[in-house]
Amino acid sequence: RLICDFVLGGNCSRGVDANSKRTSNYSPTGFLNKKFINPDLTKSKTGADYTNTPWPLIRLAELYLGYAECLVETNHLDEACTYLNKVRTRAGLPGVKEAWEQFGKEPAKATTKEGLRDIVRNERMNEFYLENQNFWDMRRWLLAEKYFNVKVKGLNIDAENINDFGEVQEVVFERKFQSPMNYLMPIPSADINR
C-alpha cells in the first residue's frame, strides 16, 4: 500500500542559506503526502491550480472495518476476518490469516481475540491514513495518552545526501495529551441552553 519517492530539497527542507531559510511551509518530518492529491494538478508558474474534489463522508472500508472491530469484540473472529479480507482484497493484499501465517512474526496472531484486535486497529490506521480517523480511534480505544505523548520523529531534513536524509531525527514540537481531561469534549453552550 505504501509507495515512496525520496527527494532532497524542495518543501522537505528549511532552505540552504540565510536567504532561503524557512520558518514555515516545509515538512518538519521530511514526509510530504500525496493521498487525495489530484495527479493532474501541478503548481503553475502563475500560482497554484485547484479543483473541487468530492470528499466521502463515510467509505465502505470504514463500514467493513468498523463491523470487523465489533465482531472481534463479540468473539466472532472468523466473520471478522471475512470483513477484514474485503478491505485487503480491494487493496491487492492477501487474506489476513494467510498474510500472518506466511509473513508475520506471530503466525497465530489472527486466530486470537487480542491479536485480531491489534490487526483490525492496524488496518484502520493504514486504510484511513490522513483521513482524520486515527485521532478518534485512539481516543475511543483509550490509547491516546500512550501514543500522543511520544516525541514526533521524522527524517533528517537538513541532510545533504540521501544516506543522511534517512537518519531518524526527533522533530522539535511537543504534543501533550492529558488523561482523562483530553478524552472528554465540551458540550456547546447552545446545546445546554436548549
Please state what every model-predicted region is.
Residues 2-194:
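Acidic/polar-rich alpha-helix caps and helix-coil junctions
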